[in-house]
Amino acid sequence: MSDVENQPFFNIQRIYLKDLSLEQPNSPAIFLEQEMPAVEVEVDVKAERLAENVYEIVVAGTVTAKVREKVAFLVEAKQAGIFDIRNIPAEQIDPLCGIACPTILFPYLRSNIADSITRAGFPPIHLAEINFQALYEQRLAEISQQQQQGGAPNGTTLN
């Protein structure tokens, strides 16, 4: 093989909105509320090997806004990407899929969530940046702790 064929290769094949759901269980009455909603945000990352050197990474986000325990809206979205990753050492694949790829996908997720909230008639909510390296390290610590306790880790790992 030539040196070019052995060079590390990282390519985004496709970025797409895999799933989007918006619920407004208390509309239209919730629009009459004057109080600002309390907003909860959850983010998760999943990775799946589709083929040799091809991975699907999904960043899932859930935004729930409540006014006095009444749900104003609930948005669930999954932003996905298909990445071609070749000639990368095996021990670097998992961090690449857990840190670099989600960092690429998150701005798309944030935009889609903000757009759907605005289109639903609510003031925009802009999600803060996420440190995916810290999130990845936290997940590794949780997996290590679960393994020490004899439990199976949650989520998807790449092998």
Curated annotation (Swiss-Prot):
GO cellular component, one term: cytoplasm
Compartments, as annotated in UniProt: Cytoplasm
Record-linked PANTHER family: PROTEIN-EXPORT PROTEIN SECB, PTHR36918
Protein name: Protein-export protein SecB
Subunit structure: Homotetramer, a dimer of dimers. One homotetramer interacts with 1 SecA dimer.
GO molecular function: unfolded protein binding
GO BP, one annotated term: protein tetramerization
